[in-house]
Amino acid sequence: KELEVALLEGHADVAVHSAKDLPTEMPEGLALAGYLPREDPRDVFVVRDDVACPKVIATGSPRRRAQLLATHWPDVQMKEIRGNVGTRLRKISVDHEADATVLALAGLRRLGISEFPGLRFEPLPVHEMVPAPGQAAIALQIREGDVERYGAACDSITTSAVDFERAVLATMGGGCQVAVGVHREGDI
C-alpha cells in the first residue's frame, strides 16, 4: 500500500513487487508495465537429511498444502510455518518443528541459498507442484499513463505468461491466499 501511495503521489515512478503477491485488480490510477525475465518457477521440497518419509510438513500456503495432500502425501500432518526463509529453514533443520517444508526455488536463488546444514533440497517438477500464478516473476507497477515509458524494460514472454496466469486467477475470484496453481509455458 505504501508503494502504491508513493506512485500515485509522484514520489516514486516504479514499484517492484513479487508478481504472485499482487492483487488481480490494480488500484485506480495504477497499472502493470510488465515483468522482468522470470526465474525458475518450481517449488523445492526441503526435507531434513535424517527423514526418509516425512510425517509433518510445514507450509503456510493453502496451494502447497492442497497439492501435497492430494498427490504426494495424503496421510501427512500439515503444520503452519511463518518467518523469513532463514527462519523457516532453521525451524526444520535445528528446531525440528517439522520434517519438511516447501519453498519457492526463485526465492532461494535470489537469497543465494542452494544448501543448508542438515537439509536436502529437491526441486519439484511443475506438473507435480503447480506454482502460484506469477510465481518467480518480478512485476513493475507504475502509474497508468507511464505504460509505454516502462514497458520496454519488461520481458514480453514473461509478461504474456504471467498476464495469462493472473487472468485465470481473476476468473476464479482468487488472490494470493487461495489454493490455486496455474503456470503457462510457451504459446497457447
Enumerate the language-model features and the residues they cover:
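Glycine-rich loop at the start of a catalytic domain that most often binds anionic cofactors/ligands
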Residues: K1, P27-G29, F116
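N-terminal hydrophobic or amphipathic helices and topogenic motifs
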Residues: K1-S18, V182-I188
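Residues within well-ordered alpha-helices
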Residues: E2-L3, D21, R64, R88
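Alpha-to-beta junction loops
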Residues: L8-H17, D21, V94-A106
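Short connector loops at helix/strand junctions that flank enzyme active sites
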Residues: E9-H11, P27, D40, Q135
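Conserved beta-strand termini and adjacent loop/short-helix elements that scaffold enzyme active sites
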Residues: H17, Y35, G60, I81, ...
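A conserved helix-loop-strand patch within extracytoplasmic ligand-binding domains
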Residues: A19-V76
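Small-molecule-sensing regulatory modules
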Residues: Q67, T71-I188
